[in-house]
């Protein structure tokens, strides 16, 4: 091979001299303005090298792509890079500019957009990274994602997106937030929706105007150049992820998703440790856990694939302290010491904290394992000492036989019931911090499935315990499950009603139909049953119409309903009759609203469907408000208030007047069919008995 005026002309040519038998033509120099031409008759097996430099420049080349044997990634490189072919079967090739999205394979044969250059093109050329002869031709960077400075990000926006200097300066805080909270990392991915949700929360907290999702994607790519996207997840649940970026360890955003199942899978697939530790390891638990990963439940899918659900629950909730057990003058059971009482307090507190931890991570499937581990501890050792957890010598394990004795002990039963009320109320406030806030349907369904499984899980875990203990524990869990079902239903109604309240034409039709209702007739019929003040009823009617006419939002309606409850129950504050007055108000509210709906039905009102939906929502939300007012007045949790009515025999005297108790007792005296049955069944028996008498 000869070098003809090497490097002396901008339009340098490369001459090839082959053997005599080949008689291959020689490429002649061409002017700089002439188009790129390809040598047609080159025989690779007979190309010979002539002494001289083995690297030739082919003019001004904008960008070259190099092959990195270690990273297996193609990367853009500034300047001109030249490669020496290895072996006699390859051709001398100059690789020129190309888009950055080069597939990660070793075959590249492209030549384009080069002015003033004559090249030899081949579709099977290899690029050898080790062929560089001069260090100043090394690639400037690899294709790994790397963060830009704030100035570089603004420059990229102005250059690539055409954003003016004024607009780009307004985005300084947005770009700086990305630099402060995120960093590049290999083998890590973040859901695109999660990152955008973090950004929206940042804008809300700092009173900034957020950009839309598409523009936000441009902001990210201006800061983290080379960022790629991947679609990850199971079929039907896949989401777009940014690949090569993660939260910084010191970012405050970590508290929103600390140790979630997603982070365990994507960022720490091997070394991540479960946050909860059962009191003991059960035989086969590890195998069951491994097998369950192959058959993902809906709850696992929500926790793994929808990390953004974390923003809809209260992960910063503070778990209240438990009260001390009030032993009074009751003697301790035989074989039980105060040390056992203290050990039970410590063990049950840690068990409840583990439950809180699992629910915060939306790992509902672990609740069953927690309960199995707690209620099926090891029996006492032969020497009578308590076993200790091998992983933590400070955490005792109550033997199962002693645990049964303690659960039969009346002061401990009351103490554990109070602790359960605190625990389950905290879980409700974590999962549904705001009953009116929009929640994804997948999260709502996961919560409802969780509530459906609770009673069965606890019953199976306590199958060896006496029925009295199981009944007491399941009663509180039932109240918790019922509360979750009610609140998720209320949330569903709120989202459906929100669309109605935002529709101007529907609101106008509702107002027109409501003005045709004969409220005087409604009041006349309801007064005998409810015995309400006429002035109060008229005021509520006028306020309702005014609020509807103003096309108030759902939040404004919620405030109006809250004011109604305050106004009605204010005369009973501090009185023992407060719970009864609250229940009576719910009955009267429901009766009046049903009378209005009946009138609308008889008049064939066009907005009947909208009124029916609104009525369902307002009845449920009124129940929610009254429930919390009664809990506040009695010093109990809402779970405790509702739990008292789940079992008639344990109904608190605080929530019922003596007249109510005596009336219910006298009605049921002497009827063997009714005694010992739940309230619902008693009502059915009494109804059937009355119909037979008729």
Curated annotation (Swiss-Prot):
Compositional bias (Low complexity) at which positions? Answer: 300-309
* Sequence ranges of Polar residues compositional bias: 288-299
Cross-referenced InterPro entries, in alphabetical order?
DNA-bd_RFX, RFX-like, RFX1_trans_act, WH-like_DNA-bd_sf, WH_DNA-bd_sf
Q: Which Pfam families match?
A: BCD_RFX, RFX1_trans_act, RFX_DNA_binding
Task: Output the GO biological process annotations, alphabetical, semicolon-separated.
Answer: cilium assembly; neural tube closure; regulation of transcription by RNA polymerase II
Query: Which residue numbers delimit the DNA-binding region?
Result: 174-249
Which Gene3D superfamilies does the protein's record reference?
Winged helix-like DNA-binding domain superfamily/Winged helix DNA-binding domain
Residue spans crossing the bilayer = none
Q: Which UniProt keywords apply?
A: Cilium biogenesis/degradation, Cytoplasm, DNA-binding, Nucleus, Transcription, Transcription regulation
The molecular function terms of the Gene Ontology recorded here are: DNA-binding transcription factor activity; RNA polymerase II cis-regulatory region sequence-specific DNA binding
Q: A Gene Ontology CC term for this entry?
A: nucleus
Q: Where in the cell is it found?
A: Nucleus; Cytoplasm
**Recorded superkingdom:** Eukaryota
Q: Where is this region: Disordered?
A: 268-309, 659-694
Signal peptide interval: none
Family, per entry: Belongs to the RFX family.
The entry describes its oligomerization and partners as: Homodimer. Heterodimer; heterodimerizes with other rfx proteins.
What this chain does, per the entry, is described as: Transcription factor that acts as a key regulator of ciliogenesis. Specifically regulates expression of genes required for cilium assembly and function. Recognizes and binds the X-box, a regulatory motif with DNA sequence 5'-GTNRCC(0-3N)RGYAAC-3' present on promoters. Required for neural tube closure and neural ciliogenesis.
What protein name applies here?
DNA-binding protein RFX2
Show the taxonomic lineage: Eukaryota, Metazoa, Chordata, Craniata, Vertebrata
């Amino acid at each position: 091979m000869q070098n003809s005026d090497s490097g002396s002309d901008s339009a340098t040519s490369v001459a090839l001299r082959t053997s005599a038998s080949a008689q291959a033509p020689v490429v002649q120099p061409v002017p700089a303005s002439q188009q790129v031409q390809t040598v047609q008759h080159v025989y690779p097996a007979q190309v010979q090298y002539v002494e001289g430099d083995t690297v030739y420049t082919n003019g001004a080349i904008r960008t070259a792509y190099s092959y990195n044997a270690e990273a297996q990634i193609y990367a853009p490189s500034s300047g001109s890079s030249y490669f020496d072919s290895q072996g006699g079967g390859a051709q001398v090739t100059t690789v020129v500019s190309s888009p950055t999205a080069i597939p990660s394979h070793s075959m590249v044969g492209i030549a384009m957009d080069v002015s003033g250059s004559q090249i030899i093109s081949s579709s099977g050329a290899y690029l050898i990274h080790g062929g560089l002869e001069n260090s100043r031709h090394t690639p400037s960077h690899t294709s790994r994602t790397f963060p830009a400075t704030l100035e570089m990000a603004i420059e990229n926006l102005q250059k690539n997106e055409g954003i003016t200097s004024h607009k780009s300066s307004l985005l300084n805080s947005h770009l700086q937030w990305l630099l402060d909270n995120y960093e590049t990392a290999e083998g890590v991915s973040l859901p695109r929706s999660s990152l955008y949700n973090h950004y929206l929360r940042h804008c809300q907290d700092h009173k900034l105007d957020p950009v839309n999702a598409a523009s936000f994607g441009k902001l990210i790519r201006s800061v983290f150049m080379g960022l790629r996207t991947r679609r990850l997840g199971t079929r039907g649940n896949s989401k777009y992820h940014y690949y090569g970026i993660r939260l910084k360890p010191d970012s405050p955003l970590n508290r929103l998703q600390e140790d979630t199942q997603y982070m365990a899978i994507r960022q720490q697939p091997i070394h991540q440790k479960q946050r909860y530790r059962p009191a003991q390891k059960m035989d086969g638990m590890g195998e069951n856990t491994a097998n369950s990963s192959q058959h993902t439940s809906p709850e696992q899918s929500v926790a793994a694939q929808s990390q953004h659900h974390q923003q809809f629950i209260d992960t910063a909730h503070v778990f209240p302290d438990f009260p001390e057990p009030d032993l009074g003058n009751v003697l301790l059971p035989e074989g039980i010491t105060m040390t056992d009482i203290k050990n039970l307090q410590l063990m049950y507190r840690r068990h409840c904290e583990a439950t809180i931890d699992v629910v915060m991570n939306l790992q509902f499937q672990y609740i069953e394992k927690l309960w199995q581990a707690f209620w099926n501890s090891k029996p006492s050792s032969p020497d009578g000492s308590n076993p200790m957890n091998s992983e933590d010598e400070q955490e005792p394990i109550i033997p199962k036989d002693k645990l049964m004795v303690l659960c039969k002990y009346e002061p401990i039963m009351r103490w554990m019931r109070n602790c359960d009320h605190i625990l389950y109320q905290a879980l409700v406030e974590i999962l549904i911090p705001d009953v009116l806030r929009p929640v994804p349907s997948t999260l709502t369904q996961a919560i409802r499935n969780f509530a459906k499984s609770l009673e069965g899980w606890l019953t199976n875990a306590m199958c060896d315990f006496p029925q009295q203990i199981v009944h007491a524990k399941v009663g509180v869990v039932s109240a918790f499950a019922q509360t979750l079902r009610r609140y998720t239903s209320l949330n569903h109604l709120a989202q459906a009603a929100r669309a109605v309240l935002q529709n101007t034409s529907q609101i106008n039709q509702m107002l027109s139909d409501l003005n045709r209702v004969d409220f005087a007739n409604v009041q006349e019929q309801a007064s005998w049953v409810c015995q309400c003040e006429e002035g109060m009823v008229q005021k509520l009617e006028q306020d309702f119409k005014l609020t509807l006419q103003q096309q108030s939002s759902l939040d404004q309606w919620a405030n109006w309903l809250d004011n109604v409850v305050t106004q009605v129950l204010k005369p009973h504050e501090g009185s023992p009759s407060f719970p009864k007055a609250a229940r009576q108000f719910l009955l009267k509210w429901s009766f009046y609203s049903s009378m209005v709906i009946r009138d609308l039905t008889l008049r064939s009102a066009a907005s009947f469907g909208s009124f029916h939906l609104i009525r369902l929502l307002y009845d449920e939300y009124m129940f929610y408000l009254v429930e919390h007012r009664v809990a506040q007045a009695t010093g109990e949790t809402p779970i405790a208030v509702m739990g008292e009515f789940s079992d008639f025999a344990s109904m608190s005297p605080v929530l019922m007047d003596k007249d109510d108790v005596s009336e219910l007792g006298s009605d049921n005296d002497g009827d063997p069919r009714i005694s010992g049955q739940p309230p619902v069944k008693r009502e059915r028996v009494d109804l059937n008995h009355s119909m037979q008498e008729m």
